[in-house]
């Protein structure tokens, strides 16, 4: 199943304007973004209306409808302590948290996750972290994460809360994710 730009606009009413505001998507159009989403979706098994609905709900919330593909916060909270270590960053105050803050449509966070994605994609996103915020990197890394966490399975059984926890590490923004999901279900199913 392929999605259309009309469906994306019905699910994320601000997507077109937000793409223009996203500094990493400079010059991109909604047509081009739609084409990229469709280009990579099959590779990652996002091929049914239900899977698309769940995937789009998560990325709509995480990116504020494509407005941001880089975490707004500085990333300092990932720089020291147990959280830094869990994410593969060094526990020293050396800037790893800021360097490996969340990027992509689903905010890939931490040196460990960047290194794992690098193994898959072949681009050195550990050294060139900004690649994860640019269109291809933002889209592919979110779909890679989706497959890595087996989120298609949870989409198939309509487990929005579980998908949210696995995408976000908690239930942050659950009501908004549900709103996007319900809208996507109406549009796609």
Protein language model features and the residues they cover:
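Non-transmembrane alpha-helical segments in soluble domains
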Residues: 38, 56, 143, 164, ...
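Proteins synthesized as precursors that undergo proteolytic processing into mature forms
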Residues: 137-139, 148-155
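Extracellular low-complexity, O-glycosylation-prone Ser/Thr/Pro/Gly-rich "stalks"
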Residues: 172-189
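Peptidoglycan-targeting cell-wall enzymes and recognition modules
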Residues: 2-32, 36, 55-145
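Short, mixed-charge amphipathic alpha-helical segments
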Residues: 42-47, 127-133, 155
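Surface-exposed patches in mature extracellular/periplasmic domains of secreted proteins
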Residues: 45-55, 68-72, 152-163
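Acidic helix/loop microenvironments that form the catalytic cleft of cell-wall polysaccharide enzymes
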Residues: 59-62, 155-173
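Amphipathic, Lys/Arg- and hydrophobic-enriched alpha-helical face
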Residues: 36-42
């Amino acid at each position: 199943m392929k999605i259309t730009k009309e469906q994306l606009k019905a699910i994320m009413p601000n997507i077109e304007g937000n793409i223009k505001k996203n500094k990493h998507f400079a010059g991109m159009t909604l047509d081009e973004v739609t084409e990229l989403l469709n280009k990579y979706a099959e590779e990652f098994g996002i091929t049914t209306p239900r899977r698309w609905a769940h995937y789009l709900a998560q990325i709509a919330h995480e990116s504020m409808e494509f407005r941001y593909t880089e975490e707004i916060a500085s990333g300092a909270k990932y720089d020291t302590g147990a959280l830094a270590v869990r994410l593969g960053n060094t526990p020293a105050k050396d800037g790893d948290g800021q360097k490996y803050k969340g990027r992509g449509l689903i905010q890939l966070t931490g040196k460990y996750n960047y290194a794992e994605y690098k193994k898959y994609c072949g681009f050195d996103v550990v050294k060139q972290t900004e690649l994860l915020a640019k269109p291809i990197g933002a889209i592919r890394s979110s779909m890679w994460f989706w497959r890595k966490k087996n989120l298609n399975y949870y989409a198939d059984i309509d487990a929005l809360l579980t998908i949210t926890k696995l995408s976000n590490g908690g239930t942050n923004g659950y009501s908004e994710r549900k709103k996007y999901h319900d809208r996507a279900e109406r549009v796609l199913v």
